[in-house]
Structures are given as C-alpha cells and as structure tokens.
C-alpha cells in the first residue's frame, strides 16, 4: 500500500496503518538513530518517540512529502535534541550485528563487532551536521536532493557536509 494512503488512513485513526508504517520503516530509522546516538537503547527510544508523536499528529506531514524522508528527518531531529538536552555521550556499546556467515565462528563475531565499534566511535566524533548527512545518506539510503529538502538547506551544503564527513571518517579509521 502506498505511503499517502497509509497516512490518510492513519489520520482517520486506523491503528493498522501505523503498524504498517512502523514495520516498513523501523529498521532504517533505527539504523539512522543508532548512527547518530551510538546507544542502542537511546536509538530505540528515539524511534518510538517519533512514532508516538507521528501517531498523535499525522496531519503535521504535508501530503506532498516523502514519508520515509519525513520520518528520517524526525528521527534525526529527535536524536539531535537528545544530544543537546542530555549531552548524551555515545556509550560505544552496541548489540552484536547480524551478519550472516561472518558470525559462524568466534573470530568472525569478534571482527564484525570490532569493526562496528570503530565505525560507531568514528561517527560519534563527527560534528552533528556531518554525522546527520552521512547517516541519512548511507544508513537512511536517502539521495542528496532528498536530504537537502528535509534539512531545508541547499544540495551543495549537503554534498559538502557529506564530503567533509567522509574525509574525517577516513582519518579516524
């Protein structure tokens, strides 16, 4: 079912519509929240807070907007607010990633876990604007144009934040 139809059904208090939206986008949203917060519990709380707000006010979303992009932006904003309000420091403790095959042996689990840890630590060192753009582009699979629209900045700004963020990640890793 198309997103617009689901949002319309949600505005008519259809709980199944919210359930479908949640299951369609929760993994992508959790990935972005985790990349921004580096704390699995805080990331999950962030996504749930966004869905609670969205369920209470689906009319806030303009009909012409991309639902996934809108929810990604809500998660990014919520994560930034958590960081500002609580001065949330990344915990650097992550759940074991689920990479099939690589975790079949203890060495594979250790390598995957160490790589994930290094990436999350490096992401946490980026300035918030760069971390947001890198997360939305890589983890959220959003195009630069979509990110620019959601952040309400120029596409050149998004591209430069991404470029500088990636350059810094390379130096950190």
Annotate the PLM regions.
Residues 89-116:
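Internal acidic/polar
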Residues 1-28, 35, 124, 171:
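N-terminal module of bacterial RNA polymerase sigma factors
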Residues 25, 161-164:
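Residues within the DNA-recognition helix of helix-turn-helix
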Residues 31, 45-52, 65-77:
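Structural recognition of an alpha-helix C-terminal capping motif at a helix-to-coil junction
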Residues 133-137:
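A short pre-motif secondary-structure segment
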Residues 33, 84, 131, 166-173:
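Short, Lys/Arg-enriched C-terminal cap helix and immediately downstream tail that follows
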């Amino acid at each position: 079912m198309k997103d617009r139809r689901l949002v319309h059904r949600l505005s008519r208090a259809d709980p199944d519509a919210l359930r479908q939206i949640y299951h369609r986008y929760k993994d992508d949203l959790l990935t972005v929240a985790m990349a921004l917060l580096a704390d699995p519990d805080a990331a999950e709380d962030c996504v749930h807070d966004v869905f609670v707000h969205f369920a209470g006010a689906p009319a806030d979303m303009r009909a012409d907007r991309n639902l996934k992009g809108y929810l990604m932006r809500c998660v990014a904003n919520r994560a930034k607010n958590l960081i500002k309000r609580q001065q949330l420091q990344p915990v650097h403790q992550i759940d074991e990633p689920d990479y099939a095959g690589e975790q079949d042996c203890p060495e594979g689990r250790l390598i995957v876990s160490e790589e994930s840890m290094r990436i999350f630590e490096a992401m946490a060192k980026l300035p918030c604007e760069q971390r947001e753009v890198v997360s939305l582009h890589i983890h959220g699979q959003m195009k630069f144009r979509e990110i620019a629209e959601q952040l309400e900045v120029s596409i050149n700004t998004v591209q430069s934040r991404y470029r500088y963020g990636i350059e810094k990640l390379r130096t950190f890793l």
